[in-house]
Amino acid sequence: MPTITAAQIKSTLQSAKQSAANKLHSAGQSTKDALKKAAEQTRNAGNRLILLIPKDYKGQGSSLNDLVRTADELGIEVQYDEKNGTAITKQVFGTAEKLIGLTERGVTIFAPQLDKLLQKYQKAGNKLGGSAENIGDNLGKAGSVLSTFQNFLGTALSSMKIDELIKKQKSGGNVSSSELAKASIELINQLVDTAASLNNVNSFSQQLNKLGSVLSNTKHLNGVGNKLQNLPNLDNIGAGLDTVSGILSAISASFILSNADADTGTKAAAGVELTTKVLGNVGKGISQYIIAQRAAQGLSTSAAAAGLIASVVTLAISPLSFLSIADKFKRANKIEEYSQRFKKLGYDGDSLLAAFHKETGAIDASLTRISTVLASVSSGISAAATTSLVGAPVSALVGAVTGIISGILEASKQAMFEHVASKMADVIAEWEKKHGKNYFENGYDARHAAFLEDNFKILSQYNKEYSVERSVLITQQHWDTLIGELAGVTRNGDKTLSGKSYIDYYEEGKRLEKKPDEFQKQVFDPLKGNIDLSDSKSSTLLKFVTPLLTPGEEIRERRQSGKYEYITELLVKGVDKWTVKGVQDKGSVYDYSNLIQHASVGNNQYREIRIESHLGDGDDKVFLSAGSANIYAGKGHDVVYYDKTDTGYLTIDGTKATEAGNYTVTRVLGGDVKVLQEVVKEQEVSVGKRTEKTQYRSYEFTHINGKNLTETDNLYSVEELIGTTRADKFFGSKFADIFHGADGDDHIEGNDGNDRLYGDKGNDTLSGGNGDDQLYGGDGNDKLIGGAGNNYLNGGDGDDELQVQGNSLAKNVLSGGKGNDKLYGSEGADLLDGGEGNDLLKGGYGNDIYRYLSGYGHHIIDDDGGKDDKLSLADIDFRDVAFRREGNDLIMYKAEGNVLSIGHKNGITFKNWFEKESGDISNHQIEQIFDKDGRVITPDSLKKALEYQQSNNKASYVYGNDALAYGSQGNLNPLINEISKIISAAGNFDVKEERAAASLLQLSGNASDFSYGRNSITLTASA
């Protein structure tokens, strides 16, 4: 019940009187005189409210002083009686259970009974958490109760004055104002008793069905009855409806009044039937009051009846009023269906929540339906009143009665909801007492069991995917909205959890029921942030399957934050580091990519959680997340990956390292970088007017707000590093470095040492520096710079530029790969293979070897010097090529589809081949050209063949087979040996790598599919 001030009471009384005056304004003089006289008769009984205190009353919880002080503030007269309480109740109230009575002094409130009622509400309020319309708080105070009674009395008694007018006009009977007032007092006593009943055990659903049946068989009311029967099936909905059964009796008032065509006997019979057969004795006081008014009013006016019946049938139930309630039932059914699986896994919380929504939904539906019917009846009477003067006072009376009932309904609704919530809370408490475990934690256990069932195929295959013997999988079950909702409903927000983390073990495609026997220590401690795999005898994968919340303890406190508002606040006593002890003797994999390392603490401030990982002597792999880490890799060949999640803009620096494998890694998180962040969120749950906000930890994969964060990793004894998907920077040490750029346009410098640098995807720049380096461009348009030393450069796909530096002793391999590449050799002996595409090859001043295959595009060889340069046409027969001079260049054409076209440059252009004849001191010629079978063309043999053609006035071109100097399969062996020596020297390959690289550049003996013979090739000379 809301707190009502004296001013509001005065305003309500004034409004009721003004309404009556307005109705009277259009009436005749005799009507006005009658109303005035009736008002005078009832003034003493109706407008005087007295708090009666017997001499033997001392006061209980709400002290006598509180009652007296409150009555004074509200203008309620306080009287002390010399008689004791027993004598007064017999004289005035007839029973000790009545709260309000009527004497010649006025309307009296019996102080002992009021105090008893207050105590009952206060106990109920404490039991229910203080949330039912200020039960145990404001309603527990005398002021609110007294003021509410005063408001009800004022409204009802004002209507009684209008009832007297009807009596005088229609029947001339002699019904005194005191009789009407007594009937009103009986109504209020009954409604107060009904609203105060928290333990009524009658089944509301059964009564509702009976009521619909009775109304369906009652003349003029069958339409409304049918609609009531069409309510959702509420049978067996639960004991939560027990608190509503008494309230339903109030509906009888509206229906008895609404049947204006029924005679007095019918109305009386309907009242008795509704009261005794359907509602029992609960509505007796209300029915007595209504029957008394029926006798006084004589509602048989035909003009009013037609409009009234039509209005009631049309307006009785509005579907819009029940949409939200229907959704509530629908959701409850879905939750109940969802709960079936988890019941089997040992958790009944979802079913409990579904029951709560069904029970409170039934309460909501019933009360909403009652209120809707009451409102529609009142509206119907108001409509009828426009055609009849008699209808006007009837409308005012019904408005007063329905207003009183609606007030009781509203004041009782919250208590009903809380009653249901308390039952659910009792179930939870009993379960925890029996099992010695947190109920909501048990809910997460069930969720995790279902997760394991649903994802078994994936989880059981991780050991194969990562090539290990055992998988140790850590899973975080995050905040569950249904579990959180149940905690809020039952006022258990301080007992719930943000989730729970679990550890599971898999071997040979099977989940182990318990941890392996060799684990003597605690493997996983999420409170302290410790993970210990040091006992493991197997190669192991440590993987965080779902984002893991930061380590630490959650502390919760539930407090009241408003009139009906409660909040459960969360404090995290966090640990700022994860400490991981790795497998000692077996190579293992540590996947930290789902580890949350940033926790938002408000105002764009973040708490960082580092990873400290102590690995063993095996060949380990580490996948890092977006936060800082210290990796002590130990012995073995260890690899650290930054490309499995967004780890920011990466700079790897080994320039200051004093030991091999030591790097400082700086990462900038900001801009477009998204990282896993732990955040605190709130779930809000409503139980009627009570709202419960529960804070919990969750995570977001999002941008860092407002600023850039810089993270620093310290890596020790790490042999290989894989970058991010962004533009990374790598600066190598003076030792051997192995860097992978991964995706993005990377800048990689090996510096000193024999380095291996991989650009991977993106337009990368790789610089080997000093040392025998291997550089791999990968996809993209890359630039590879070999630096001093013997280098191996492979451009990969894309339009790449490869260049090497070094003196005459250097030996380098330059392989362009697919794309239009540019290859620049050194002063030493270089092996240049442009690959597919239209490439430029410049060998430099050393004795270089060029390589060309039939599937390549148009290559340009621009050789600047060297006295023993060679070209290997590895899969081409000289019978499939022709040579022709074009200015100072020599053009080699190759056959395509058995057609050799002189007008299409599809082979090789030898730049400045003939410049030496013009006095050029440089040697731009290739001293030996080999075909696949070891036959050789030299500059001299080619010159003679061209001169022969010219001197005999023949074509300006010459077939390769006609320009041979000598030929033998054995000529290939020295060439192969030279290629092998360059490969062996370049890039510091180990034995296996040498063989692999050599096989890529091996000469083919039978690669051509052409039919050889002068007439098998069609030669065209078109432009």
UniProtKB/Swiss-Prot annotation:
GO terms for molecular function: calcium ion binding; channel activity; lipid binding; toxin activity. SUPFAM superfamilies: beta-Roll (SSF51120). It holds the Pfam family RTX_C. A lipid is attached at residues 563, 689 (N6-myristoyl lysine). It is a multi-pass membrane protein. GO terms for biological process: hemolysis in another organism; protein secretion by the type I secretion system. Disulfide bonds: none annotated. Residues 747-763 have a biased composition (Basic and acidic residues). Hemolysin-type calcium-binding repeats lie at residues 731-748, 749-766, 767-784, 785-802, 815-832, 833-850. Keywords: Calcium, Cytolysis, Hemolysis, Host cell membrane, Host membrane, Lipoprotein, Membrane, Myristate, Repeat, Secreted, Toxin, Transmembrane, Transmembrane helix, Virulence. The chain crosses the membrane at residues 237-259, 267-326, 364-410. The keyword Repeat applies. InterPro entries: Hemolysin-typ_Ca-bd_CS, Hemolysn_Ca-bd, RTX_C, RTX_pore_form, RTX_toxin/Mannuronan_C5-epim, RTX_toxin_determinant-A, Serralysin-like_metalloprot_C. It is found in: Secreted; Host cell membrane. Residues 747-780 are annotated as: Disordered. Belongs to the RTX prokaryotic toxin (TC 1.C.11) family. Bacterial hemolysins are exotoxins that attack blood cell membranes and cause cell rupture by forming a pore. The Gly-rich region is probably involved in binding calcium, which is required for target cell-binding or cytolytic activity. The three transmembrane domains are involved in pore formation by the cytotoxin. This is Hemolysin, chromosomal. It comes from Escherichia coli. The gene is hlyA.
